[in-house]
A protein has these predicted regions:
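Acidic, glycine-enriched catalytic cores built around paired aspartates
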Residues: 1-180
Length: 180
């Protein structure tokens, strides 16, 4: 991961922008191209098949994080983020993740603080009930889902107004229900 990030940055800095000739700085995030670009990218060495959705941000491929939230965050923070203009991790947690933890707010504070101290740049955090998201997909007319807002990346959207494909991709990211 670090070697790929460094290589990408070295290639980009060889180019200059059209506004003052400053060296280019790559980004490690995508507003929507992780979904829209899937048909233009073949299979990848991590086991992703051609046509599958790409990983969102600097996260692993949806469903590929097998060791848990903290190892994923440590891996994401291992690249030198000062070389990039952006790179967020998507932390999509189900409420049961906090079962057995005395203070969920202290856990989030401590997790976030450790991530930033280790070099991480940005966290997009959700605590959403997977069952509610799935029900909202099937029953968008229900009053309780009219104001269900989710953070996509650099913007938010009402969940029921998203296309079915985007809803499914978003739900596929809800992979942290426990520490491991």
């Amino acid at each position: 991961y670090v070697r790929v990030c460094d290589s990408m940055q070295e290639i980009a800095e060889g180019y200059v922008n059209q506004r003052g000739g400053q060296p280019m700085r790559p980004s490690l995030f995508a507003f929507m191209s992780h979904l829209e670009g899937k048909d233009n990218i073949g299979a990848t060495p991590d086991g992703r098949h051609a046509g599958d959705v790409l990983a969102h941000g600097i996260n692993p491929q949806a469903g590929a994080s097998k060791k848990g939230l903290i190892p994923m965050a440590n891996s994401a923070a291992s690249a030198d983020m000062r070389k990039f203009q952006g790179g967020s991790i998507q932390v999509d947690i189900q409420p049961r993740f906090f079962d057995g933890k005395e203070n969920r707010y202290a856990y989030i504070r401590d997790f976030s603080s450790a991530f930033f101290k280790s070099g991480g740049m940005q966290i997009n955090l959700h605590i959403l009930d997977l069952k509610k998201l799935e029900d909202a997909m099937e029953h968008p007319e229900k009053p309780e889902y009219q104001d269900l807002v989710v953070r996509i990346t650099g913007y938010c959207a009402r969940f029921i107004t998203m296309s079915r494909e985007y809803q499914q991709e978003f739900v596929s990211r809800m992979n942290y229900s426990s520490m491991s």
